[in-house]
Amino acid sequence: MVLEIRNISKNFGGISALTDVSFTINEGEIFGLIGPNGAGKTTMFNIITNMYAPTAGDIIFNGETITGTPPHKINQKGICRTFQNIKLFQQMTVLENVMVGRHSRSSAGVFRSVLRVPSQKREEEEMMMKAKELLSLVGLDSHIHMVAENLSYGQQRRLEIARALASDPKLLLLDEPAAGMNEKETDSLYDLIKEVQKRGITVLIIEHDMPLVMKLCDRITVLNFGKKLAEGTPEEIQNNDSVIEAYLGTEEEDVFA
């Protein structure tokens, strides 16, 4: 077991965003976290990465309680994420964006590397090789010198994944990675996430594209109004009446097709 979410609750004033939510993720899984808008999915990501402190409950990663651990140390322990809203360095090149992500695994600080301290030259070269490898993985190897803001939306999504992978995560959190993608880009994203899984990285994904989720995930937890509604395999979730009802009463074929 890589991650255990244990009885997590989160209140914002008098509003309960999450209430006593628990689930576990096994090593090597692609695990889906789904639910209608406002269900508490991104709040859960923010708690896992300690951008928010939980009101109650604990986060256990590889057997260690990490509740309250500073976000940069959570990253160093092997958890990295992407965001709903793309957070790239838009004026930096594609390669530079991934290099920044790689620095969390470097003994050299960003500023020492910028100053080109001689003792760090070899490490900097190794980091660049790793960054180029990841850009090849996500299909951006021909765009390494392009400024990030000039990439298409789908390409920026892939760059954000490459930057997250640069820190060598054991657990990768993807927050709506298919948002804004066309069908071809979504198919390519599926292949990319499957390749990430083959590399031994566990994936926790929030996604509203139900066909992608059902094809991609090994198991799924469904949240609704901050509470755990259901958990199971894609087949079990597709046949769960409570899940269908949670999606505003939409017919099953419309939700999952």
Model-assigned labels for residue ranges:
Residues 2-257:
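Glycine-rich phosphate-binding loops of nucleotide-dependent enzymes
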